[in-house]
Amino acid sequence: MEKLTILLHVAAVLMSTQALIQEQRQKAKINLFSKRKPSAERWWGDNGCSLWGSCTVDAECCLGNCGGMYCSLLR
């Protein structure tokens, strides 16, 4: 009976250790994915500029070329 109790304690410690390690791995994966940016955001940055949206000044366009009412893709 005593051996069975010791065996159950060892099994409980091993299972809790495994659960703790898996939890840390999940947190690491979440941190990895949260740092990644979508492709468009990596390419154009996150400065709120527009490719072909409406504009009033050059600074509102990603390419810095406001064609009067809309951003121009040509410089």
Curated annotation (Swiss-Prot):
Domain comment in the entry: The presence of a 'disulfide through disulfide knot' structurally defines this protein as a knottin. The cysteine framework is VI/VII (C-C-CC-C-C).
Organism: Conus victoriae (Queen Victoria cone)
Tissue specificity note: Expressed by the venom duct.
Positions annotated as propeptide: 20-41
Cystine pairings recorded for this chain: 49-62, 55-66, 61-71
Keywords noted in UniProt: Disulfide bond, Ion channel impairing toxin, Knottin, Secreted, Signal, Toxin
Pfam families attached to this UniProt entry: Conotoxin
Record's protein name: Conotoxin Vc6.15
This protein's record includes keyword Kinase: no
Keyword Cell cycle included in the entry's annotation: no
Protein task: Inhibits voltage-gated ion channels.
Subcellular location: Secreted
Family listed: Belongs to the conotoxin O2 superfamily.
